[in-house]
C-alpha cells in the first residue's frame, strides 16, 4: 500500500505499508551485508536511522552458514534489523560475473522462506550502450521471469511483496516498453535498474532521461526505486523526477577508500587533514577532528567514516522531505545540480519533458518561486502559466514593456486606467503577465534577481508567437490611447467595474471558462482593511469566493461551488465518486482514492474541485491532492480534502 502525504515537482512524501510495517518516502535503504562480521556500521545505528534496509538473498543462499540461520530464524534475525527488509536476488552478481548459481524461481522461493518483506525477481541487468538486439533479447527474458515470478507467488500464496525491475539499457524506447509491460504486472515496487555504470561515469543526462521515460509508463500508485543510487548529491534531482526509494553500499565502500561524503560531492580524508574541524556537525564530525580520524587504525577510521557517510546521507533525505513540505524542492534541485557540471546536464535535459512533469507539479505552493539561474526558466510553474494564458479569451489586447524598477504585482504599482482592454506586461521570466491576474501564484509570489541580457531575451520567441497568434486583437499605442481617453470620461468610467473585471479574468485563468458573465451586476467585493486587496467576492452579501492571501487563488464557498458547477461543462474540474460515499461527501468528510470512479483528465495537484456523483449531482467541493491519472490509479489515501458538503434538504 502506498499513499501520498505531501508533494512538490514529481517528488512525493509518501507512506508505504508492508506486512504491518511503515516506510516514509523518499528514503534510502542502506545495504547491509548478510554476514554481520562483514558489516562496517553497527546494525543498531541503522535501526535508529532507517525504516528499511536492503541485503543480498543470493549471498545468503550460497553461503551455507548464513543460509542455515536465515532458513531457521529468518532474515530479520540474521541481519538484526527490525523493520522492512528488502533483498536483491543476485542480479548484481549477474551483472558483475555474468552468471549466478540459482534459478529464477529458486530465489523467489528462498526469499519467501526466509521471511523477506520485499523480494526481487532475478532480472537481467543489461549494461549501458549494448546493441539494441542484445538489450531487447535480455528484456524479453526479464519479462518472462517477471511473469513466472508473479505466477509463482500467486500459485503458492506467498506473502512476499515483489520488486519488478525496469530494464532496457540506454535505449529509451526499450525503457518505456519495459515500464509499460512491467507496470501491467502486480508488483508492489518498481526499481529502475542498471543505471550504476552511468552514475559512475557521471552520465547524469542519461540517468535523468531513463528515469523520466520509465516514469511515463509506470503506474503512479506504486513507489519507484532507483537501484544503486547512494550519493546524496543525486537524491534531490532523482526525487524531483519521481523516485521514492534509493539503495547503496556507498556509505561503506567510500569509507573503505577514505572518502568522505557531502551533499555536494566527495572529499578524500587527505584533503581534510589540515582543517581544524570537519565541515559537518554529525555525531562523528562533532566528536573527532580530521587529524584524529587520519591517525586512527584503519578499521576504526573506516567505521567512523562510514557512520559519517550514513549520517550525511540521511540528513540529505530529511532536507528533501522538508523541501517537499515547504514547496521549494526545485530550488534545492537547482542548488545541488550546480555542484557538478555533469549533474547540471541532468537538470537541463528535463526541460524537453516539461509537458509531462508539469502534470504532477502542484498548481500552488507554500513557498514562492525563487529564480536561482537560467534553468529556472524551464520550471513547470512558468510552463503552466504560458499554457494557461490560452484560457483567457481576449477581445482587445495591449502589450507593453515597463521599467525593471517597477515591482510586482504590477497592477498595484502602475497607474492603470480601467477599460475593456487587457493590458499584458512583457516579463523576462513569465513571458507575458496580464494585469488582471498578476496577483496570482506565481506571478507576484516570486523573487527574481537582476538578469543578464541573454536571460531577458529567453521569452522573445514566446512573445512573438503569442502576438502573431493574436494579431487581430492586439492594439497599437494610438488605438490603446483612444480607448483610455474614451473610458477616462466619467460616464464611461462608471460602466467599468475593475474589481469584477479582475475577478472574472482570475476565474477564467484558474478554471478555464467564463464563470460570472450573467451574474456580473449582482456581485461585489470586500477588501482587506490592512492591505486593501480583494479578500471576498460577494453575491447579495453572501461569500461566493474567498481570495486566498498566499496565492490569490479564488477558493469557492458553497455559492461559488454551485456557480462553478453550473458554468463548467461536465466533467471539467470534477471528481466523480462512487454512490457508497455520497453521504460522507455531503457531510464534508474527505474523499478517499478508492472511491473515485472518474475525473476531469486535466486535473493537477492542489486544484479546487467539485465532487459529484455519476449523475453530476454536486455533493461537495474541496482541494484535490492528486492529478487525474493518480486519482484513477491510487487505492489508498485521501484524494480530495473537502471544504464543504451540500447536504440534502
UniProtKB/Swiss-Prot annotation:
Disulphide-bridged cysteine pairs: none
- Molecular-function GO terms, alphabetical: pentosyltransferase activity; RNA binding; zinc ion binding
The GO annotation for biological process reads: tRNA wobble guanine modification
Give the protein's cofactors. Answer: Zn(2+)
Gene3D superfamilies in UniProt: ArcTGT, C1 domain, ArcTGT, C2 domain, PUA domain, Queuine tRNA-ribosyltransferase-like
Record: residues binding Zn(2+): 280, 282, 285
Q: Which NCBIfam families match?
A: arcsn_tRNA_tgt, tgt_general, unchar_dom_2
Q: What does this protein do?
A: Exchanges the guanine residue with 7-cyano-7-deazaguanine (preQ0) at position 15 in the dihydrouridine loop (D-loop) of archaeal tRNAs.
Similarity field: Belongs to the archaeosine tRNA-ribosyltransferase family.
**Protein name, UniProt field:** tRNA-guanine(15) transglycosylase
From the broadest rank down, the organism's phylogenetic lineage runs: Archaea, Methanobacteriati, Methanobacteriota, Methanomada group, Methanococci
